[in-house]
Amino acid sequence: SSTSRGLGDVYKRQVHGIVGRNFLRFTAGGSATHSDHGREICHTLHEADPNGNYKVKDPEKLIRIAKEWGVETEGKDIYDLAHEMSELALLEYGKPFGTQRFLKRAPQHTQEIWEREEIAPRAIDREVACSLHMTHMGCSSLPEALVRQSLRSGLSDGWGGSMMGTEFSDVLFGTPKPIETEANLGVMKEDEVNIIVHGHDPSLSEMICEYADDPEMIAYAKEMGAKGINVAGVCCTSNEVAMRRGVPMAGNFLQQENVVLTGACEAIVVDVQCIFPALGPLSKCFHTKFVTTSPIAQMPDAEYIRFNAKTAGENAKAIVKMAIENFKNRKPELVHIPHMKQKATVGYSFESIIKTLDKVTNSQVDQTGTLMPLWQCVASGVIRGAVAMVGCNNPKVRPDTAHIELMKKLIAHDVIIVASGCSAQAAARAGLMDKRAKDLCGAGLKRVCELADIPPVLHMGSCVDISRMMVLVAELAKIGNVNISQLPVVGCAPEWMSEKAVSIGNYVVATGIDTYLGVEPYVSGSTEVTGLLTNGVRDWVEAAYTVEKDIDKLGDAMLARIEEKRAALGV
């Protein structure tokens, strides 16, 4: 009957709302997670004290951000300023009016797009709450509205919570600069106490590193029969301590169980995000202590030591001591450490990239402290473009293969890579962050690597540090006097998996950067939502998603898009 046909059409229509709601909820989960990380860093900054657990290690950056925010700095004690700035930063999470402070870093054209499309993020928590409200029963089911809020919620992460997490981590722990490290399971040491830090919050890992370097703890380790203490990292916590301290990187997300399987891990100490619940039961098969430290990530079969800024020192000391005392419980017959490891140069923050470029700038003729040398390389065609390679590795595909093969293909075509998170660790383990990897590059990029003394894949940090990439493209667009969407730059998450990756993808696209995925997002059940993400949003923000599971074709698509953008610019 006509009635039943009409109802059938209604039901078919509802699928688009269901898919759109799920996409928005996924985004909100990722945005909340990254932004809560940033909030914790702001709280830690509020506890900073010259005689306390946490100190201000980059006062110049704190002063620079304060001036950017219109805060008076003259004559202020640096710790008073830190406390004032932390309170202002925390207000960004719940302020009743206005939009995020860091949005002003974007080019004017981008800011105008955000205002016109009504996606400029307001208070961070408001965007998450609004997303959950919109997806409650009886609220939004219009795909356009749901996708628009997904972009807004993502922007509150990338230009809000993540950016604060990045900037104030630099203030507390030091702004990264190029430093040598090693990557892969071969960084574990058979004759030392091995402590693995895993998760995302540098507040924990920095303190563990402090006490692992303590002469008293090292002496105690030798007393217990070890030659010393070796700290290595997994996941984004690893990126944090690698780029500031040169701490070796044992592996990324899908390597976390393998560090326990070496039989040489005295303790795996975790904070939040991307932690396998299976680590508890697995650790019981060995002598490993599985230590959780956050009320946000409590798990079975773990030893829980509540970690906070006020008690950080005593907590970290207790954990390091526990690991040392566990060394004697190793079972030699279960110890197997693979010999594989690679050299890597990491720590290319935005500030470090500027300083690296200054080394190849003729200061007698050209202004230093800018991205002009990079723009000139791109405009001249010596470098064809850049790809931000980010995101997870994924058990649905052969882990890390897409990251590594795409990077090799891109650098061979003179495309420089900036990488973060698990993608960065994949590159490091494959030797692509070794300066000798220049030999895999096309002639133009190889020459740039030689002149600037850099690897072809630049380690820019953890997943929250994709905010550094946003600042980089914003400043490059300003230097080139073009819009971000016109730059021969694309983003790629070939093995994305987590909710955070969806939030990242949304803020990268909303910033005007075409983004390429190698794993399908959970929207294929709706032609309308799929159409919006792969095409429709381009009318809003001048960028969109491309999904291609064939990795070779994905690489070709990125190269073609870069050349298309170059042709449009006439360079």
Annotated model-derived regions:
Residues S2-L7, Y11:
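Single conserved hydrophobic/aromatic residue that forms the stacking wall/gate
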Residues G8-D9, A145-P178, E182, D191-M249, ...:
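Conserved mixed alpha/beta catalytic, RNA-binding, or beta-rich assembly cores of soluble enzyme
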Residues Q14, I18-R21, A264-E333:
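Mobile "lid/hinge" segments at catalytic clefts and subdomain interfaces of large enzymes
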Residues Y93, F97-E192, S203-S205:
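Low-complexity, highly charged intrinsically disordered N-terminal segments
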Residues V247-V260, T288-T292, K408, R429-V464, ...:
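Acidic, Ser/Thr-rich peripheral helices and adjacent loops at domain boundaries
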